[in-house]
Amino acid sequence: MSMDFSALAQQFTEFYYNQFDTDRSQLGNLYRDQSMLTFETSQLQGAKDIVEKLVSLPFQKVQHRITTLDAQPASPNGDVLVMITGDLLIDDEQNAQRFSQVFHLMPEGNSYYVFNDIFRLNYSA
C-alpha cells in the first residue's frame, strides 16, 4: 500500500465532508454499483441510489464538524476502515446533532472507493 492508511483516512474524510457540505450530488464518483449505504434504517445499494438518497435529505445547508477520526487496515489487500464521530449543523439550527459514520474503503487502481457506508445520528438517552 503506497499511502499510509491514517493519511488516506484523513484525506478521504476532508474530501468527503467538504463535498457533502457543498454539493452532495457530486459524491457519486466515490461509490460503485456494489457499494452499500445504511443511512439510519434505510439500506441502499449502488452509486445511483445512494446519491439519490443523499440528495433527497430534507435540508438545504449542512455542515459536518469532525470530532474523532479512527482508521485501521481492513485486509491485506489495502482496504481501510474509517470511523468518524462529530456534529452536524443543519440549515440554521443552533443545536448540533451528534453523528457517527463508518466507511469501508476499497482500493481501485491508484485510488479508493466507498464499498460500505454506515451513517447514524446519535440521540441523547
UniProtKB/Swiss-Prot annotation:
Gene Ontology biological process terms from the UniProt entry: protein import into nucleus
Subcellular location: Cytoplasm
InterPro entries: NTF2, NTF2-like_dom_sf, NTF2_dom, Nuclear_transport_factor_2_euk
Gene Ontology MF: a single term: small GTPase binding
Domain of life of the native organism: Eukaryota
Annotated Pfam families: NTF2
Coiled coil (UniProt feature): none
GO CC, alphabetical: cytoplasm; nuclear pore central transport channel
Residue ranges annotated for the NTF2 domain, each copy included: 8-121
This protein's UniProt keywords: Cytoplasm, Protein transport, Transport
PANTHER family: NUCLEAR TRANSPORT FACTOR 2
Protein role: Facilitates protein transport into the nucleus. Could be part of a multicomponent system of cytosolic factors that assemble at the pore complex during nuclear import.
UniProt-recorded name of the protein: Nuclear transport factor 2
Gene that this polypeptide is encoded by: NTF2
